[in-house]
Regions:
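Terminal, regulation- and interaction-focused segments at domain boundaries
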Residues: 1-33, 132
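Amphipathic alpha-helical hairpins
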Residues: 25, 38, 49-50, 97
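Compact, glycine-rich, soluble single-domain proteins
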Residues: 39-87
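Beta-strand/loop substructures that line and gate deep hydrophobic ligand-binding cavities in soluble
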Residues: 85-113
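Well-ordered alpha/beta subsegment
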Residues: 108-135
Length: 135
């Protein structure tokens, strides 16, 4: 996978951080930006508890009802993709990646007005900041 790509509506960014570090950074940055952190899912931990093996993989669910509600009011089907999610995983080579749904992809998928895409575009800056190397 090449750095900073969009594949089938997923924005994918490389990071030097571990999966757990990325997820912690997403939570911290989301709260600092006034977003609600609804949940963090540790898929690899869940797999381990089930007696299975999965490379480090996790998801943070974040949102802002003031931003998401107008989008859902305009096009109820977008609720299947909201709240917004940030996925972090480690690949077979040990590289860590961060992915999230591109706002324009969600707009095209659900057909809500283009003016509302900005309401769900917060993940562009949030994911980039979470993936970025500290100065």
């Amino acid at each position: 996978m090449s750095p900073d790509t969009t594949v089938d509506g997923l924005r994918i960014l490389p990071t030097q951080h571990s999966v757990s570090q990325v997820l912690q950074r997403v939570e911290s940055l989301a709260r600092a930006r006034g977003l609600t952190v609804f949940a963090q899912i540790d898929f690899s931990g869940d797999a381990e508890r089930a007696g299975l093996t999965l490379r480090p993989t996790g998801l943070v669910i974040v949102g802002n009802p003031k931003a998401g509600t107008p989008v859902m009011a305009a096009t109820p089907t977008v609720a299947i993709d909201l709240p917004l999610k940030v996925l972090a995983w480690q690949d077979a080579e040990g590289k860590t990646w961060v992915a999230y749904n591109d706002a324009e992809y969600l707009r095209a998928r659900h057909g809500f007005p283009a003016a509302l895409a900005k309401n769900i575009s917060a993940l562009d800056a949030l994911a980039a900041a979470a993936a970025a190397q500290d100065p």
